[in-house]
Amino acid sequence: MVFDRTISVREKKAAKTLGIVGIVFFILFGIVISGVAFQKEWVQQLDLFFIDLIRNPAPIQGSAWLSFVFFSTWFAQSKLTTPIALLIGLWFGFQKRIALGVWFFFSILLGEFTLKSLKLLVARPRPVTNGELVFAHGFSFPSGHALASALFYGSLALLLCYSNASNRIKTIIAVILLFWIFLMSYDRVYLGVHYPSDVLGGFLLGIAWSCCSLALYLGFLKRPYKAA
């Protein structure tokens, strides 16, 4: 079996940092999911504030911005991110970095399974709007689009940070990916298919998952090349 190269001191430190950041985000997610599950007033106030901020004035049917939002939200669907994650994982495998490829694909896949389980557990109905802008089915919390974008694009951004690319390239691509994550989260509230707390929960869980899974890879899965 082929493993990845030896972990460096820098990567050991990165694994610890990512693990700590991931745990913090998991704790924040725990606060949000408990607030949603027990219908806390602060969650309702948060939802009302951001719904008014994002959807006032209301979306205009046929507008260029609404068309762009419809288009962009497609890039956070699991039916797109999961197959691409598989292709990326296979590409890493062809590069003799099997552990990295397996980690990337199963990190995304397990995140999707966790999402579906949490939706059934919380069973939060979707918001009722005055007009359906896009069809959405299933329960509302957490937002699948927010989680998928934070997990998939967040994992790509983290991998980029620890690559050999120049700092300028890293910064440009990382900023683009982070902007894309926030845009995907904004879209779901703008279209009226999620509460802001759904999006916040999906974002926090996606970032927590990507940080902790990369920490696991850097800390335990990377090994010197050897054959078995």
Language model regions located:
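Membrane-interface loops
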Residues: 48-51, 84-85, 89-167
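Membrane-embedded catalytic cores of phosphoryl/pyrophosphoryl-handling enzymes
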Residues: 3-9, 128-228
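Short hydrophobic alpha-helical membrane-anchoring segments
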Residues: 30-36, 113-116, 120, 158, ...
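N-terminal transmembrane-helix/juxtamembrane module of multi-pass inner/ER membrane proteins
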Residues: 1-79, 120-122, 126-128, 132-133
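Alpha-helical transmembrane spans of integral membrane proteins, capturing the lipid-embedded, hydrophobic core
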Residues: 27, 104, 108-112, 203, ...
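Alpha-helical transmembrane segments of integral membrane proteins
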Residues: 18-22, 99-107, 169-176, 201
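Short hydrophobic alpha-helical membrane-embedded segments
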Residues: 77-83, 177
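Membrane-helix interfacial "entry" motifs
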Residues: 9-12, 62-70, 92, 96, ...
